[in-house]
């Protein structure tokens, strides 16, 4: 297993574009950005002022933004510039010089590798403040009065609040790997637990993993799963994402393999998911069993 880049005494993993794991354009090595001092490969000292929408801490250098993951507002650090695009640079931590008292140890053991979360290194009140500031900043840029934005409401306790899960399927040494894309790359990080997901969604992920041998005849077509849970009732609806339309006998196989493995399951769907996109929500789906909604 690769080292967790959240360890703040070692360089962090390269910044990415968010949980989708999309690739980012890179400026040729040594090329200067549209601002003095920002050159790919160079190390500079920055002080972070705010969090960006993709979970990176953002500093301003000569009027240009430098975004670095796993840092926090108020911190000062030496960073290495990894890439430059359209005058905006991304970098990685090299040495933390001034730490923020609002940085905490993430609860999730996958944080720093998994691309599903980017904020767990900040204490929860700081997360809410930064998310409120993001909305206000967006309104300001649109010339809409930011005082219309109320402070963000939190979830107490701030765990198990996500009621929708999108997971991807990969392979490693011939075995299936179920989890989320790594931040900034196409590699799949296997996830056994997720403290921000509702337990019903985690149970669905565990059930798919346990049923994989039974699902092997269709495994080549399966690329992910979409799970939704009703927070009040605990009802779960599961969509199995496939790159092609499953045959009738394959659909029966999926129903038999999963029906008794997932607690509170009320609906099972086949989601059409061609390889050209990682997004699963909003795609065409066919009902295999039960009903197409939770209540």
Predicted regions and their residues:
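Accessory RNA-recognition modules of RNA-modification enzymes
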Residues: 2-295
């Amino acid at each position: 297993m690769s080292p967790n880049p959240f360890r703040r005494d070692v360089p962090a993993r390269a910044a990415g574009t968010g949980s989708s794991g999309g690739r980012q354009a890179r400026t040729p090595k040594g090329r200067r950005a549209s601002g003095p001092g920002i050159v790919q490969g160079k190390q500079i000292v920055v002080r972070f002022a705010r969090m960006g929408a993709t979970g990176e801490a953002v500093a301003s250098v000569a009027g240009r933004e430098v975004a670095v993951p796993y840092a926090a507002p108020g911190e000062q650090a030496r960073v290495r510039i990894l890439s430059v695009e359209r005058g905006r640079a991304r970098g990685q931590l090299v040495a933390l010089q001034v730490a923020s008292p609002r940085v905490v140890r993430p609860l999730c053991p996958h944080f720093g590798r998994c691309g599903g979360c980017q904020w767990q290194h900040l204490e929860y009140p700081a997360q809410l403040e930064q998310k409120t500031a993001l909305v206000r900043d967006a309104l300001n840029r649109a010339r809409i009065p930011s005082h219309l934005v109320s402070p963000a409401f939190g979830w107490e306790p701030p765990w198990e609040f996500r009621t929708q899960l999108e997971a991807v399927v990969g392979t490693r040494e011939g075995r299936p790997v179920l989890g989320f894309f790594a931040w900034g790359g196409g590699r799949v990080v296997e996830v056994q637990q997720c403290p921000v997901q509702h337990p019903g969604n985690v149970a669905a992920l565990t059930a798919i993993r346990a049923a994989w041998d039974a699902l092997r005849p269709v495994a080549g077509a399966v690329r992910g799963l979409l799970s939704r849970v009703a927070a009040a009732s605990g009802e779960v609806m599961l969509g199995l994402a496939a790159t092609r339309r499953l045959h009738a006998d394959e659909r029966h196989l999926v129903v038999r393999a999963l029906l008794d493995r997932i607690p509170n399951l009320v609906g099972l769907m086949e989601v059409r998911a061609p390889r050209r996109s990682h997004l699963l929500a909003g795609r065409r789906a066919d009902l295999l069993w039960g009903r197409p909604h939770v209540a």
